Regions:
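Alpha-helical transmembrane segments of multi-pass small-molecule/ion transporters
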Residues: 1-315
């Protein structure tokens, strides 16, 4: 294993610590990451390019072998998290800008970190990759449509413009990554070795930019937003697990869909908020806090399931 690979793996495994550190720096020195703001869409594009670079045709085999599990996962992703976000916003009577931010992250597809957490939890990694990939590829259509339906009454939303943003920031970079992988083949291995490092660097810069731009609102409403994020994430895990259980999927798929549903592509949420709600930077805060929290909670949940699996294997 190369030094770059070792460093990259270490950074990837300690992501939550780096996210919390950069959020703290941005809070106490908000101008530190001010320069990052205009580059948020590009940073997300780099992350999505990395996702495309690692995808293989075999990653979609499960879509044909076990379509039921993938379909249930994708439906659960785009039903549970948006609905939960909307209900939390209404039940807690959240201010419009915060409510829109919570709903926005709820309407995003699953996050790529869910694949790692599924592996650690001894879930079905192939299913995790397929659900993440499919939900991401159809997000240009579903994310703006569901977001408009649930949050259109709260703030003015340009769904068509948002669709184009997702195509540019998500779909195009993924397709480009697939093409590069197809053309270069094994030569992309050195690039993929650095992906955890590059992805973590990109997302912590996005977090820093969002937190720095919203310091005032975080002081005013940070505890409320964090509480909603924790509830949103936790309910996602719970309902994702039972969605798989109630539809007769095996235990490894139940763990997988719990993680898939509960963990969001919060980087996309932050990028969309920065691009379409620049006048209300607090809209991006739920996504930024989600980025920090879901990696902590996902690690804890994966560790619990891994320990449980090890215990059951002992004679």
């Amino acid at each position: 294993m190369s030094i770059l690979n070792k460093i990259s793996n270490f950074i990837g495994k300690t992501f939550s610590l780096w996210a919390a550190l950069f959020a703290g720096i941005a809070f106490f020195a908000p101008d530190t990451f001010k320069w990052v703001g205009p580059y948020i869409p590009w940073l997300l594009g780099i992350i999505m390019f990395g996702m495309g670079l690692t995808l293989k045709p075999s990653d979609f085999d499960i879509l044909f072998k076990r379509p039921k599990a993938v379909i249930i996962g994708v439906i659960a992703q785009f039903a549970i998290m948006p609905a939960t976000a909307y209900l939390l916003a209404k039940l807690l009577n959240l201010p419009a800008e915060i409510a829109v931010g919570v709903i926005l992250v709820g309407c995003c597809p699953g996050g790529t970190a869910s694949n790692v957490m599924t592996y650690l939890a001894r879930g079905n990694v192939a299913l995790s990759v397929a659900v993440t990939s499919v939900s991401t590829l159809i997000s240009p259509l579903l994310t703006p449509a569901i977001f408009l339906m649930l949050a259109g009454e709260m703030l003015e939303i340009q769904a068509g413009s948002m669709l184009m943003s997702i195509v540019k920031m998500v779909l195009f970079p993924i397709v480009l990554g697939l093409i590069v992988h197809k053309v270069l083949g094994n030569k992309t291995e050195k690039l993929t070795d650095a992906l955890p490092l590059v992805s973590v660097a990109a997302i912590v810069l996005i977090i820093g930019a969002v937190v720095g731009a919203s310091k005032g609102k975080i002081i005013e409403s940070g505890l409320l937003i964090f509480t909603v994020v924790v509830l949103h994430n936790g309910i996602g895990y719970l309902l994702g697990f039972f969605a798989a259980k109630w539809t007769g999927l095996p235990y490894d798929a139940q763990k997988t869909l719990a993680i898939e549903v509960g963990m969001q592509n919060s980087g996309l949420g932050a990028a969309l908020a920065a691009a379409h709600f620049a006048a209300a930077p607090v809209v991006a805060v739920p996504s930024a806090l989600f980025s920090v929290w879901h990696n902590i909670s996902g690690s804890l949940l994966a560790t619990y399931w891994a320990a449980k699996a090890s215990k059951h294997k002992k004679p």
